[in-house]
């Protein structure tokens, strides 16, 4: 129904953001990867959207890129993968890394997404492997490996901060501002310094 939404970015919650357009606040569910790339609150943004209607729920899902929206829709074609699971998968890394993991049959990367078990990961790989085109094949393998390693470090650092009592939202925000070239231990130390100010 809606192709996209433009408006002022008002607030962020665990799995959705609020965009104001014509004095109406729209609740837009989105992925962690889109959230990590959003500008400061108060700025104008545009998200490509998909509306999902069920008997007990109506929701709008939005993403910064058409590529992420397309991947979201593709994931929904898999039996057992709903909107929540699709967002979870898109939150473990960027779209390119997820596509690469599916294409390479990398169950380990896919099962890092909360709520995605081994059987679901296998089903995703089986059904989508031949449907996915990966633009990142234009990049060299070293760059791809570095992307996966960076995403893994970010996830582990966020998990460590959550264990220490910080919220996932707070942890993500701080970790994403840290230098990803550092070791996992250095990233956590840098984040803690910032949080303890």
Swiss-Prot record:
One function term, GO molecular function aspect: four-way junction helicase activity
Region Domain I, annotated ranges: 1-64
InterPro entries in alphabetical order: DNA_helicase_Holl-junc_RuvA_I, Hlx-hairpin-Hlx_DNA-bd_motif, NA-bd_OB-fold, RuvA, RuvA_2-like, RuvA_C, RuvA_C_sf
Pfam families noted in UniProt: HHH_5, RuvA_C, RuvA_N
Region of interest (Flexible linker), ranges: 145-149
Region (Domain II): 65-144
Record key words, sorted: Cytoplasm, DNA damage, DNA recombination, DNA repair, DNA-binding
GO BP terms: DNA recombination; DNA repair; SOS response
Function: The RuvA-RuvB-RuvC complex processes Holliday junction (HJ) DNA during genetic recombination and DNA repair, while the RuvA-RuvB complex plays an important role in the rescue of blocked DNA replication forks via replication fork reversal (RFR). RuvA specifically binds to HJ cruciform DNA, conferring on it an open structure. The RuvB hexamer acts as an ATP-dependent pump, pulling dsDNA into and through the RuvAB complex. HJ branch migration allows RuvC to scan DNA until it finds its consensus sequence, where it cleaves and resolves the cruciform DNA.
Domain remarks in the Swiss-Prot or TrEMBL record: Has three domains with a flexible linker between the domains II and III and assumes an 'L' shape. Domain III is highly mobile and contacts RuvB.
Subunit relationships: Homotetramer. Forms an RuvA(8)-RuvB(12)-Holliday junction (HJ) complex. HJ DNA is sandwiched between 2 RuvA tetramers; dsDNA enters through RuvA and exits via RuvB. An RuvB hexamer assembles on each DNA strand where it exits the tetramer. Each RuvB hexamer is contacted by two RuvA subunits (via domain III) on 2 adjacent RuvB subunits; this complex drives branch migration. In the full resolvosome a probable DNA-RuvA(4)-RuvB(12)-RuvC(2) complex forms which resolves the HJ.
Name of this chain's protein: Holliday junction branch migration complex subunit RuvA
